[in-house]
């Protein structure tokens, strides 16, 4: 895509910070779920990144209407119902890693709100992150069995879906408020659940429908009522 548009990856100081935050997200997310329940992990990831983005918005003196705070609370309640986290014993180290992931993703999103060239900036961030990750991959003791199919899916997921998805995210971020972006992220687990229903025939229970109403309602509230 960069070649077609005659662009090149951009490398700036912000690219290093963005890449480091991306690495924090990648490592924290990947290793946390080895010891942390899915529901708890989702709550920490999306809730934590929302806190980081809201705190950044306050620091940058972004005007936040009361309805947006109320909408966030309603959406978080919907997320809680959707993931239905159990309160079983989770590894404290795994929980800490997920907090690291939430901080990394929140910071990556905040930095993206000030980018003007989403595609080339994302490419630069990915290249720097790859340079950081490769040495870490050799340090971490882990035996991983791979095959050609898994290798292909990893390449496709990283270069196509993640690359284009993150570029789109960086394109959207400068056009909306940071707090609006943080709340909009809560649709991700909702979309994932619906995708499971469409593509792998997972069932949708009452929790999904209630969560959908709360999450979408919470996101819509500050759009229609801006006070």
Residue ranges and their predicted role:
Residues 1, 22, 64-84, 133-134, ...:
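Hydrophobic transmembrane alpha-helices of multi-pass small-molecule transport proteins
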Residues 4-45, 74, 81, 158-176:
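Specific transmembrane alpha-helical segments of multi-pass solute transporters/efflux pumps
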Residues 27, 41-48, 112-130, 162-198:
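Helix-helix packing/entry segments at the starts of transmembrane helices
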Residues 9-12, 84-104, 138-156, 203-213:
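Juxtamembrane helix-entry segments on the extracytoplasmic side of multipass membrane proteins
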Residues 11-20, 64-75, 95, 117-127:
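Cytoplasmic-side transmembrane-helix entry/capping segments in multi-pass membrane proteins
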Residues 1-6, 31, 48-70, 190-209:
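C-terminal transmembrane-helix exit sites in multi-pass transporters
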């Amino acid at each position: 895509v960069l070649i077609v548009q005659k662009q090149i990856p951009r490398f700036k100081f912000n690219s290093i910070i963005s890449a480091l935050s991306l690495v924090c997200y990648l490592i924290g997310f990947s290793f946390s779920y080895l010891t942390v329940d899915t529901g708890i992990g989702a709550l920490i990831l999306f809730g934590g990144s929302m806190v980081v983005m809201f705190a950044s918005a306050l620091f940058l003196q972004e005007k936040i209407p009361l309805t947006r705070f109320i909408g966030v609370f309603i959406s978080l309640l919907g997320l809680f119902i959707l993931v239905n986290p159990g309160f079983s014993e989770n590894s404290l180290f795994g929980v800490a890693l997920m907090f690291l992931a939430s901080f990394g993703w929140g910071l990556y999103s905040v930095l993206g709100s000030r980018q003007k060239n989403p595609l080339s900036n994302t490419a630069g961030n990915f290249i720097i992150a790859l340079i950081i990750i490769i040495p870490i991959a050799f340090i971490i003791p882990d035996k991983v069995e791979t095959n050609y199919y898994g290798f292909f899916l990893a390449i496709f997921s990283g270069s196509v879906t993640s690359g284009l998805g993150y570029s789109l995210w960086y394109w959207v971020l400068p056009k909306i408020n940071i707090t609006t972006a943080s709340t909009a992220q809560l649709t991700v687990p909702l979309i994932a659940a619906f995708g499971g229903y469409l593509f792998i025939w997972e069932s949708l229970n009452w929790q999904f429908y209630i969560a959908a109403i709360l999450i979408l309602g919470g996101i819509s509230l500050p759009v229609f009522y801006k006070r």
